[in-house]
């Protein structure tokens, strides 16, 4: 009796967009991620599903694209969580490269060697995700199931099921957000039918089409790191650096329920290269650590479209971004 398990990587989340390390940090889906979910829902429209599982992190709960149309309950399974990143959690990838370039490379290229304080090893991730798949198969004999998980966890699991060592897995590719893989489970045998298929995503909606790190031989990318330049009475200014040179600043002020961005600067040479969104991500991170539920800013009319892409909405003369961890409606296609 064969059980089919569709593995789905979660939609684009804040860590993917802002280039921040989110392993088991509970981040949320971006507006672009919700657009990806609309295409994922369409891909599975004619597919019978008997159950939908996912890790217990918020960004996989948005598998609602699969279970809500079918009247199914979401089944959280912590065994499918992303790798725990220890002291790397919530650091920008630029900061991590600056701290330990070799360990950053090992994370992508030599997972067998990767060791970080407070983190899991990839061997531990391999073992628990395998346990999760076997549990799903045992609970759904002969059924067809979808299971939502995470990039590094899925890469490790799929490579293992294809007979690779951890060292060999470091030479395999990465799956885009909402990429789909298919397993067939019969007894103790688990076969990978296909993996990392994101053909349902148009280029304009793909996360990977806008990023280069996954194409690089060492999986590196130029990334900003941040340092506090000034802080006083609820106001804070951070500098954004590449290597040791300052290329931008962001100034913020705490209000009772929100964080106000009072200044947002990036040198012209870096504009249009996805560095500006890393500045915005730093503000989101800081707002969350301070318990604020919104970002507020004022900007010229010609920049409102830019901020609207990332979830800001106009409110009078200002724009507001809602930071609450809530499940939003998946848009319709067309």
Where are these regions (language model features)?
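Loop-to-helix element that buttresses phosphate recognition and phosphoryl-transfer chemistry
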Residues: 9-62, 116-130
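Acidic, low-complexity terminal tails and accessory targeting/binding regions
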Residues: 2-3, 87-95, 160-229, 325-334
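Conserved acetyl-CoA pyrophosphate-binding loop and the N-cap/start of the following alpha-helix
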Residues: 32, 270, 274-282
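Conserved GNAT acetyl-CoA-binding A-motif
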Residues: 287-299
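C-terminal "cap" of GNAT-fold acetyltransferases
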Residues: 298-302, 310-334
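Conserved beta-strand in the GNAT
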Residues: 239, 245-253, 260-265
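Phosphate-coordination/substrate-recognition cap region in phosphate-metabolizing enzymes
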Residues: 38-104
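A short, internal acetyl-CoA/4′-phosphopantetheine-binding micro-motif in the GNAT/acyltransferase core
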Residues: 79, 264-271
